[in-house]
A protein has these predicted regions:
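Active-site acidic/histidine proton-transfer and metal-coordination neighborhood
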Residues: 19-164, 267, 283-285
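Catalytic domains of carbohydrate-active enzymes, especially glycoside hydrolases
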Residues: 1-7, 32
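N-terminal "assembly arms/tails" that initiate or stabilize quaternary assembly
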Residues: 14-15
Length: 326
């Protein structure tokens, strides 16, 4: 799957404002997806615009709110058309930057305005869309207050039966996303997940096979929730070869889920249920060095993909022959 933002439309060189976008501006993406056996997801885009400011859907200015409400309604309709043509529901993720750099005395007002905007947006039914709302602890320049906090969107998602988006970089550095999976799934039908690697803040470093990603995969697999969690990768890696970044992050995530699927979970649960906690910890540690890498290499070979580190040479060759000449 590929998830794209509303600013990535094929506008034919014409200026099309955010509240004017239509499915026709993304038909070339849909055609490309059909030709490449891909599915598409979509994101409304409230940042980097003259009307962005510090608030969009929670702005005190009704004209500004109405502009972004219209943009988001149109974004959901575009996602709906993607899902219809590709015969697979498209996730539409709603994240806004709204907040305040310094102390605010009107938190309740801003959140009330956001709730009202969301109610108007979701009043339009889109049968081919999976809707999601995404929280964030803070943003650069908006350190003191974020309108769309975790508690706000968690409450809204539960009340309205839509997905909450959990981004690994959008929480406090000591807060682990994997611990939220089982709690959220008891109250929401599905979750949208953004797998990332925050380094001290929401830096979106390239995903690697670290403890956070491994434990996230374990929680999803062990909760039998693979069909309830929509897994998206959210990182940049602009300082290194972009294709290399894609491959490293994608393979790291695949490896994490493979490890979880191969783990001796029945034995681990037997140890836990019988109070044998030394044995549980010992087997958890031993499972880290089990020969899962050989299974992953076999998976790559079966799919005509380079195994182990062989992809390095493949990407270097592509960089030399293709990307360096652009």
């Amino acid at each position: 799957r590929l998830s794209i933002h509303a600013i990535y439309g094929d506008f034919g060189g014409k200026k099309v404002d955010r509240n004017e976008i239509e499915p026709k501006h993304f038909q070339s993406w849909i055609d490309w997806a059909k030709a490449n056996d891909m599915k598409l997801d979509f994101n409304s885009t409230s940042f980097s615009h003259p009307l962005s400011g510090d608030q969009s859907l929670s702005s005190r200015d009704k004209a500004v709110r109405d502009f972004w409400i219209e943009h988001t309604i149109r974004s959901r309709k575009i996602a709906d058309e993607m899902g219809r043509q590709l015969n697979d529901k498209a996730c539409h993720n709603l994240w806004i930057h709204d907040g305040s750099k310094d102390l605010t005395v009107d938190r309740y007002l801003y959140r009330s305005l956001l709730k009202d905007s969301l109610d108007k947006i979701f009043a339009t039914k889109c049968p081919n869309v999976k809707d999601a709302v995404e929280c964030k602890l803070f943003g650069t320049g908006l350190e003191s207050f974020t309108v769309g906090s975790h508690e706000f969107y968690m409450g809204y998602a539960v009340k309205n039966g839509i997905m909450a988006t959990l981004d690994m970089g959008h929480f406090h550095p000591t807060e682990e996303t994997y611990d939220k999976i089982s709690a959220m799934l008891l109250f929401t039908p599905e979750i949208l997940l953004h797998v990332s690697r925050p380094v001290r803040w929401d830096s979106d470093h390239v995903v690697i096979l670290n403890d956070s990603v491994q434990m996230l995969a374990q929680e999803i697999v062990w909760a039998d929730a693979l069909n309830k969690v929509n897994i998206g990768l959210d990182y940049f890696g602009a300082s290194i070869n972009r294709i290399g970044a894609y491959v490293i992050g994608s393979r790291a995530t695949q490896k994490a889920f493979l490890q979880a699927l191969l783990s001796p979970i029945k034995q681990l649960r037997d140890y836990e249920s019988s109070g044998r906690f030394f044995q549980r910890l010992a087997l958890l540690e031993e499972s880290k060095s089990m020969p899962w890498a050989a299974v992953y290499d076999y998976f790559c070979l079966k799919n005509n993909a380079p195994a182990a580190e062989d992809y390095i040479a493949t990407i270097e060759q592509y960089e030399k022959e293709v990307t360096s000449k652009r």
